[in-house]
Regions:
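Helix-rich interaction surfaces within compact, conserved domain-sized segments
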Residues: 30-33, 39-81
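A common structural junction motif
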Residues: 22-26, 55
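Short low-complexity stretches enriched in small and charged residues
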Residues: 1-2, 33-34
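Short, surface-exposed ligand-recognition loops at beta-strand->loop->(often short) alpha-helix junctions
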Residues: 2-11
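Short, conserved beta-strand edge motifs with alternating hydrophobic and charged residues
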Residues: 5, 27-30
């Protein structure tokens, strides 16, 4: 399962909210982190989050069973390995 971890701080909430709009994505919590999971690809559009670049590039705390195929000014895309 493709998994993305995002620290639970106010600046990162829009990232989690946008990820959660995909019906194939599940949002959970592990300690101080949001756990964003999907059986397939996870795509988060930066402009939809409203995040500035500094927050956008620092929101990624970790991944599991995934590989990052895009992390630029437009989107974050994780795919299963």
């Amino acid at each position: 399962m493709t998994t993305l971890f995002v620290l639970d701080v106010p600046e990162n909430i829009p990232v989690v909210d946008v990820a959660g709009t995909d019906p194939s994505v599940t949002i959970g919590k592990i300690g101080p982190y949001f756990e964003i999971t999907s059986d397939g690809t996870i795509v988060i559009d930066r402009r939809a989050t409203g995040c500035r670049h500094a927050v956008w590039y620092s929101c990624l705390a970790g991944i599991a069973d995934a590989r990052i195929v895009q992390h630029d000014k437009d989107a974050l895309r994780l795919e299963p390995p």
